[in-house]
């Protein structure tokens, strides 16, 4: 992949290009005017990972770019700073590098560094090695942890040493409210926190008149949307298959005093089967699905989007909130969903400036019977 070049002076131009591209791509669905949410033009990414490149006595952060003259060859790009990343990450990069240069124990066979930071300045650093970590490493890593004011995790094959904690606490400001989120190392979190705040605000806005119904959320992760949307609904059932994410989502529900939501460790397909009465068992019984009236579904699928069967299952809901990280798969899914639903809100979130990546939000509402295709 190409290393993004941060040029704040061309930020608006690149955002306008995305706006035009997305507007043209989805024109045939006759959506309302596109709502556009800009990113900070620099220092917008709260998590990053870098290779640690060793050259003699030197070492430096690196990324790789494909050589245009030889697609099979990757060029090593040295990074002394990274304007894409948060200011906290940029402050840590040289301080950590200097500490590594001064310690044979910490630098030996270190090949990757991962940073996870928050808007409030918390930081977690993961050091990944091609060797097993011992007591000498732990002693020096603990000293480094204190010097840098961060939490440190050491990783190697079949080894994970958590010196302090394996997470940070993010605090997001949305519509005058503060939501707190435990974000666990090596699990998915929204990388652009400013845009995440915009996404949560938009999702709250499009579901505001929903208190008489219940929400089902698929692919809920650590409860990012679950926490922010719960007060808009009578009850919420959120599904997720990752044990780590389910545990973190439950922590976040408790941290935000959300009492009307539950997280079920099951796939979207399993939930749909349970809702249809085709799947039973202890976990299904605990959800008491027959006591719910699900009027709204929220989906935030991976880049592959939804398969045809999943789209069919969504058609039973009055409203669908679709958060997409891939306009092409969103377009394909809307082709199927538009037979029964119409796009009534449409948003572009500039999650990754200076790249072709577009994050979109769509609200679909069921067509009147006579209007269905």
Curated annotation (Swiss-Prot):
Any one GO molecular function term: rRNA binding
EC number: 2.1.1.-, 2.1.1.35
GO biological process: tRNA methylation
GO cellular component, one term: cytosol
Transferase among keywords: yes
Record's keyword terms, sorted: Methyltransferase, S-adenosyl-L-methionine, Transferase, tRNA processing
InterPro entries: MeTrfase_TrmA_AS, SAM-dependent_MTases_sf, TrmA_MeTrfase, U5_MeTrfase_fam
Active site: 325, 359
Reactions catalysed: uridine(54) in tRNA + S-adenosyl-L-methionine = 5-methyluridine(54) in tRNA + S-adenosyl-L-homocysteine + H(+); uridine(341) in tmRNA + S-adenosyl-L-methionine = 5-methyluridine(341) in tmRNA + S-adenosyl-L-homocysteine + H(+)
Gene3D superfamilies: 2.40.50.1070, Vaccinia Virus protein VP39 (3.40.50.150)
SS bond partners: none
Residues binding S-adenosyl-L-methionine, per UniProt: 190, 219, 224, 240, 300
UniProt xrefs under NCBIfam families: trmA_only
Function: Dual-specificity methyltransferase that catalyzes the formation of 5-methyluridine at position 54 (m5U54) in all tRNAs, and that of position 341 (m5U341) in tmRNA (transfer-mRNA).
Family of this protein: Belongs to the class I-like SAM-binding methyltransferase superfamily. RNA M5U methyltransferase family. TrmA subfamily.
Protein name per its UniProtKB record: tRNA/tmRNA (uracil-C(5))-methyltransferase
UniProt source species: Chromohalobacter salexigens (strain ATCC BAA-138 / DSM 3043 / CIP 106854 / NCIMB 13768 / 1H11)
Lineage, top ranks: Bacteria, Pseudomonadati, Pseudomonadota, Gammaproteobacteria, Oceanospirillales
